[in-house]
């Protein structure tokens, strides 16, 4: 049973991932280069979402860096002296509960905090070019 939850299934161009989280586990702020559909199957997860035009305020690691696509800011303890644009950053927050589905468009930046033991599955499905100009301003 558990093996089916943690393996990837490849069907045409769609890939399904299932992830488990424990309380306080964090996925650092980053963007994906494709559309992402996320369903929470159990537990609670907090997502902080920002429009791609906010990448200029996020001190993103550059293309080619091992952490490219990720923010250099520690969002759990941001330092506005080191990262002054942090204070300009605008975003939205959602607390996902079991059965919730979240759609992340291409390049939307997200920071994820597990609020308790939880599990989710997601699929990435192609990309859109709607936010290409926004993300290009940050060198991507």
Segments the model singles out, each with a brief description of its role:
Residues 1-101, 109-140:
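N-terminal accessory scaffold of Fe(II)-dependent oxygenases
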